[in-house]
């Protein structure tokens, strides 16, 4: 039995849905399997091969389909590598390197080496934001710019890891779709497909449940490359005001944006991130 999936049938259902979503990838793409010490890592590469590289890291309980709405714009000016995080419901190995240790950075070292990258800009969401920030702290010479969407590790975490409490306990009838709407802040009508996908995933997938390590002020102060932090004011996972304050106070070249009326799921930031990456 898999450690991250509840059943083989569930694994197959998630994989089938992922393949369906990947068929919507709007630009030319190379599907790569990069060997790492944690097992093979699945990477989607789009954009001109000689363009500046950008690495995308999605959140927990997700995969690189996260970036379907962004990739066409970003891949015009950049060589974009959408990396499926190991231990998450995508195409990468099921290993889960221990957070707060060198293990995650060593995995990313292998990914970058396999892609023949000495450095790149990073865009990370939630757990992917934590991962990108951890890499910037540990490998500052390998991160040229850092865009973080609802990142973990800066502001206080309100709940155990993603969706755990709400999905397990909030509703006696275990209405995963409605619970996902509350956690993400997405509307049941306007974002029905996204919430259906979240419900499918958490029906069959066991997420990380531990709290994310929080970076110290001293660690954040070493992140001297340009940083863009975007958070939702109504995030129920992390204290967004705390995230914005600490990022502004501790990181020398950070720009922070707090989006009113937005929860943990931050959509529609294609243009601001592209502008940041182009500077």
Protein language model regions, located:
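Alpha/beta-hydrolase fold catalytic core
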Residues: 1-52, 77-78, 118, 278-279
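Conserved HGGG/HGGXW glycine-rich cap/lid loop of the alpha/beta-hydrolase fold
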Residues: 40-90
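Active-site loop/oxyanion-hole signature of alpha/beta-hydrolase fold enzymes
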Residues: 82-123
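Flexible "cap/lid" loop of the alpha/beta hydrolase fold
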Residues: 130-138, 143-172
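Hydrophobic, aromatic-rich cap/lid helix
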Residues: 190-218
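Short beta-strand/loop motif that positions the catalytic acidic residue
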Residues: 223, 229-231
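Acidic catalytic loop of the alpha/beta-hydrolase fold
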Residues: 234-238, 264-265
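Catalytic histidine-centered segment of alpha/beta-hydrolase-like enzymes
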Residues: 262-271
